[in-house]
UniProtKB/Swiss-Prot annotation:
Enzyme class label: lyase
Origin: domain of life: Bacteria
EC number: 4.2.1.96
Keywords for this protein: Lyase
One BP annotation, GO: tetrahydrobiopterin biosynthetic process
The keyword tRNA processing is assigned to this record: no
GO molecular function: 4-alpha-hydroxytetrahydrobiopterin dehydratase activity
Entry keyword annotation includes Signal: no
Name the UniProt record assigns to this protein: Putative pterin-4-alpha-carbinolamine dehydratase
Native source species: Bradyrhizobium diazoefficiens (strain JCM 10833 / BCRC 13528 / IAM 13628 / NBRC 14792 / USDA 110)
Family note: Belongs to the pterin-4-alpha-carbinolamine dehydratase family.
PANTHER family recorded: PTERIN-4-ALPHA-CARBINOLAMINE DEHYDRATASE (PTHR12599:SF0)
Length: 100
């Protein structure tokens, strides 16, 4: 099982992942992605889902039209772990490759 990051380690990791922030009231990180339209948003989710499945680490997320809200936390560890940081970085990379 992945180990929960300390507060300091989480803050340091977040410093290297643009636009990800701590989720208020939870030991979790989150980001809202905004795309050109629904097709791009859903395409992002599809590509991110493939990565998440390979990692066996799945996000909490919500899609409304061109917006995708993501929350990451490792439930087994009770908070943010290196897996969440890795998936956040991957999602940022996928978003950069998404046209628009």
């Amino acid at each position: 099982m992945a180990e929960r990051l300390t507060t300091e380690a989480r803050k340091q990791a977040l410093g290297g992942i643009p636009d990800w922030t701590e989720v208020s009231g939870r030991d979790a990180i989150g980001k809202t992605f905004v795309f050109k339209d629904f097709n791009e948003a859903f395409g992002f989710m599809t590509r991110a889902a493939l990565v998440a499945e390979k990692m066996d680490h799945h996000p909490e997320w919500r899609n409304v039209y061109k917006t995708v809200e993501v929350v990451l936390s490792t439930h087994d560890a009770g908070g943010v772990t290196a897996l969440d940081i890795e998936l956040a970085r991957a999602m940022n990379a996928i978003a950069k490759l998404t046209p628009g």
